[in-house]
Amino acid sequence: MSNAKTLYEKIYDAHVAVAAEGENPILYIDRHLVHEVTSPQAFDGLREKGRKIRQVGKTFATMDHNVSTQTKDINASGEMARIQMETLSKNCEEFGVTLYDLNHKYQGIVHVMGPELGITLPGMTIVCGDSHTATHGAFGSLAFGIGTSEVEHVLATQTLKQARAKTMKIDVKGKVAEGITAKDIVLAIIGKTTAAGGTGYVVEFCGEAITDLTMEGRMTVCNMAIELGAKAGLIAPDQTTFDYIAGRKFSPQGADLDAAIEYWSSLKTDDDAEFDAVVTLDASEIKPQVTWGTNPGQVIAVDAPIPAPESFADPVEKASAEKALAYMGLEAGKSLSDYNVDKVFVGSCTNSRIEDMRAAAAIAKGRKVASHVQALIVPGSEQVKAQAEKEGLDVIFKEAGFEWRLPGCSMCLAMNNDRLGPHERCASTSNRNFEGRQGRDGRTHLVSPAMAAAAAIAGHFVDIRTITEQA
């Protein structure tokens, strides 16, 4: 029997605190990220039982889900939002938790803030009451979303019961073509696996197309691991990772960093380790992707026709396609470029980092947003916003007719004022195109930042490769 382990197994095994026979092991949790929506009841539970937070120094909070992107006024997103944000402030003050509130220079989307501050490090277990916690797996950490009762458990004990997951390797072989982004890679992956293909697995993304990505690109890929049904997504840390971490606020410095890198370098799947499932993609075949349906697996290349329901052999997929086409107001056989978009959203924990802003700005520069389109650019954090403004990206966007907003989750999830009206069609860089996700009866198409910016200018979806060629 081989002792070879996958990256997931190495991190999982290193964090088992208690393994009682017949029960799920208890894992130690290295980092706990907290936001205003899933934490109020957890703090109430601590208060009722007279408990303190076990490791307050490993707990970090911010406000992101329902903050306004137009003003720092806490009342702007409505009563429920105000209550949640005020409650988070009160709870963090009472329990001694570090909070980056509305007016803090580190405020931002929780999954943007953690990595950019060096809170997220390789080999860690990281949890947050948010399904896209998988983002942090880009660093080779085991990161996953938890429910509110689990939030309370981690606050109280710094541990969590976790069953061992199955392992899946997703190998994206070779190099992608010019203009193909991390978002296109992950949408192509989900198109192949389907939105449920990773259920029960922790996925490790491998292959040249993955290791070629920057840290920000890797975060985009891992962010959407949950969208193929996986518990978490991982990418083994390498020199790209170490270079990104160096010099950040909470990352190790000097000799500590050298020692950490020596350990982090061991965090890779052993050569003869076996995965429970393997999925392979040819990177050179990946084109710019656009979702057409109501789950992220319903996705096509921008130049492909909208699929007909009868083209699906599986009766469940066929029925799902029929329902999705009706909801989305699309006709099989037509091109997605035949349909006008009403709104464009560049932002979310998937695509709101500085490289995403630069990619959208490169398309926006010297061009104008179509007259019928409202286009929002929402940086993922105050740090991203400041960097973008330093580079003059905000000016490029504003001159082109885009709205340059304040940081927050924004139009990803309709928990604030940024949302779609009924039947409005949106080119969005977010991660979920479910029915009503961006507003009741709203129609969401998931794309990369460059594709979103191009759609804003043309007024409909266009193949980014044709624009890049003209520039």
UniProtKB/Swiss-Prot annotation:
Q: What is its EC number?
A: 4.2.1.33
Query: CDD domains annotated for this entry?
Result: IPMI
Which Pfam families did the record assign?
Aconitase (PF00330)
A Gene Ontology biological process in which this protein takes part is:
L-leucine biosynthetic process
Under the GO molecular function aspect, what terms does this record hold? Answer: 3-isopropylmalate dehydratase activity; 4 iron, 4 sulfur cluster binding; metal ion binding
Q: How cofactor binds (record note)?
A: Binds 1 [4Fe-4S] cluster per subunit.
Q: Which reaction does it catalyse?
A: (2R,3S)-3-isopropylmalate = (2S)-2-isopropylmalate
- Function description: Catalyzes the isomerization between 2-isopropylmalate and 3-isopropylmalate, via the formation of 2-isopropylmaleate.
Q: What is this protein called?
A: 3-isopropylmalate dehydratase large subunit
